[in-house]
Amino acid sequence: MKLTPLRSLFVALVSFFALTAAQLGAADAQPTLPRLVDLGAGKCIPCKQMKPILDDLTRNYADQFSVVFIDVWENRDEGGKYGIRMIPTQIFFSADGKELARHEGFMAKKDILAKWRELGVEVKEPATPAAN
């Protein structure tokens, strides 16, 4: 079957919304690890500065805590659901889903790791950091 431009757009939109729904479902799923939820937007400058940090945390600390990014410009209801006042906002959750802390604004990797430790989560440096 030949895809017309309109059908191609439809397929792309369905794929995008399915992926977005899966990401949001992952944020709400009952976690087995502590979880960092970062609420931001793809075009927000401090949020863009957070992206490589979140990617690094996801790669190198996946066995210690999970990281979820939610773009609140693409998923407007999520900002209200989490009660954020500005972006980026980082929310730290325990493994049982209880909110432990939140931070508004840019947050450096060392500060995120320090916050986990302050909250009683034993965070160890990875033996060999994953390659970019």
Predicted regions and their residues:
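Non-globular targeting/processing and membrane-anchoring segments
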Residues: K2-L3, S15-F16, W116, V123-N132
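Bacterial N-terminal signal peptides
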Residues: F10-A21
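A short beta-strand-turn-helix
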Residues: Q23-P34, R76
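Non-catalytic, surface beta->alpha helical segment in thiol-disulfide oxidoreductase systems
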Residues: S94-A127
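Thiol-based oxidoreductase modules, predominantly thioredoxin-like and allied folds used
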Residues: L39, D63-R76
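Structural micro-motif
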Residues: Y82-I91
